[in-house]
Structures are given as structure tokens and as C-alpha cells.
UniProtKB/Swiss-Prot annotation:
It is found in: Periplasm. GO terms for cellular component: periplasmic space. Transmembrane segments: none annotated. This is Azurin iso-2. It comes from Methylomonas sp. (strain J). Pfam families: Copper-bind (PF00127). Induction: Produced during growth on methylamine. Signal peptide: none annotated. Cu cation binds at H46, C112, H117, M121. Residues 1-129 form the Plastocyanin-like domain. Keywords: Copper, Disulfide bond, Electron transport, Metal-binding, Periplasm, Transport. Disulfide bonds join C3-C26. This methylothroph organism uses azurin in the oxidation of methylamine. Iso-2 is probably the acceptor of electrons from methylamine dehydrogenase. GO terms for molecular function: copper ion binding; electron transfer activity.
Length: 129
């Protein structure tokens, strides 16, 4: 089982994949995130944020107010399982999180917290046996 995946985006509000499966056998899971576009992060910046599906609306709404310096994620938000910085065209980043933070009975959503991107840039993540 692979304990990492790569998600890409570009100068549109889309992710390259709509779903991610995390093997339960992994201790940690890494998401490599690449922006293959050309626009700067101030114009079309993206990130990858993971939370329980039930929480994402509030996490995104509150994160938008946290500002660019905080990558549009509220500092210390316990509902956020993992997130990457906001990146622009040609940049890449990654985030690693403990698989023990996930439950197989829970639904998770990953999304971009850049203001206005949340409704289109999202996907599902699930823990697999």
C-alpha cells in the first residue's frame, strides 16, 4: 500500500483527483500538492486542507477571515486534520499526517481554503482497511 499521493491543480479551481483512499496499514500519510499553472498565489493560489466533512463549511468560512498570512486556515483550529500552505503557479508543497487521526466510520473532505475556491475545489478522503 502506498502511504502517499500526489494532487495537482492549476490556473482553474479544480483538483486533479476527487477522491483519496488512505490505507489503514500506514502510520502516516503524505499528500504532495503541486500547482502546475502560471498564475501567482495572490491571483489563483491553492492549498489542500483536510477536515471531517461535517466541519468543512465552518472551517472554510472562518479560514477565509484568517487571511493569506495564515494560509486561510484559522491558527490552532482543532477541526483541521492537515493543511498545506497556499502555493502559486510552478510551486509544490506537501503535508504529512498521522493515519491514527482518521476513523473508518467518518467522512472526510479535502478542499482549498483560498476565498471563493471552496465550493468547487473539494474531494473526499476515506480510510481503507
Amino acid at each position: 500500500a502506498s502511504c502517499e499521493t500526489t494532487v495537482t491543480s492549476g490556473d482553474t479551481m479544480t483538483y486533479s483527483t476527487r477522491s483519496i483512499s488512505v490505507p489503514a496499514s500506514c502510520a502516516e500519510f503524505t499528500v504532495n500538492f503541486e500547482h502546475k499553472g502560471h498564475m501567482p498565489k495572490t491571483g489563483m493560489g491553492h492549498n489542500w486542507v483536510l477536515a471531517k466533512s461535517a466541519d468543512v463549511g465552518d472551517v472554510a468560512k472562518e479560514g477565509a477571515h484568517a487571511g493569506a498570512d495564515n494560509n486561510f486556515v484559522t491558527p490552532g483550529d482543532k477541526r483541521v486534520i492537515a493543511f498545506t500552505p497556499i502555493i502559486g503557479g510552478g510551486e509544490k508543497t506537501s503535508v504529512k499526517f498521522k493515519v491514527s487521526a482518521l476513523s473508518k466510520d467518518e467522512a472526510y473532505t479535502y478542499f482549498c481554503s483560498y476565498p471563493g475556491h471552496f465550493s468547487m475545489m473539494r474531494g473526499t478522503l476515506k480510510l481503507e482497511e
